[in-house]
């Protein structure tokens, strides 16, 4: 063989070997986790049959086979597609590497250093729309005072705050992000409380939603009509993910609550927001324990403080959010097995 063609042949063999190990599952390209781990300096361990752990000097990632539920530095994050496994090892959807893992590991590549001055708070429901109802408790009656408390704390820190409603009035869903857009808000935060189906009063904990990536199904797909196309909010998708991550992390840590995770949805109040936007479900009114807390003003004040801390943590992003120097702890990314 001509020596000058040998490097080209070796490159081709290496590329073909990598391509052969890739997989196409349910319409998605999956990458061998071992290849991605090696390229990013991770060591792989299999502590259980359906769980794979990736570690390096600063980070720890755990993926569960057939699970889309991830845990990142102690915070649950729902992936768009489940991790998989073949005879060569674990596989991860390239889509999730691009839209979740990479942004969360390297936020400085996705968030420019822009000063946040104006925040739009959206107290969920109002007027004829009472939201969730548990006994004589209506969701709309708790989202508004929570918004007032968050507003007051933010204003003390020098932020300008916009409310989509300040009384018990009905505001159409599309109008809410329109208010934020017209007033030049830097962030949009919609405030809600959750309710579980009958017989599931054990469910508790906050959830934080951001816009679903284009082409993926939502964690909560109700009312989306199968439209997976781009929205205005998708222009800010990575920033919204990072805001949601910091918010969920702050809520769980500061409230000592069960972590229901960062999730994706095309909620009407998120779709048209022309800035990073999230929707917070602050807890479950149907939980006998958590419900009583939600109805208590002192707990809502504590929750408001956690929300403010989440916003401040997002604002401070200037390097890897999972840097030990920044967090004082090692990175954890975890995907649990179903059940």
Task: Describe each region flagged by the PLM.
Residues 6-7, 156:
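Intrinsically disordered, low-complexity segments enriched in glycine/proline and serine/threonine
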Residues 1-5:
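Positively charged n-region of N-terminal signal peptides that target proteins for export
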Residues 10-11, 132, 183, 307:
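Enrichment for repetitive, rod-forming helical segments
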Residues 137-339:
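Active-site-proximal helix/loop segments of hydrolytic enzymes
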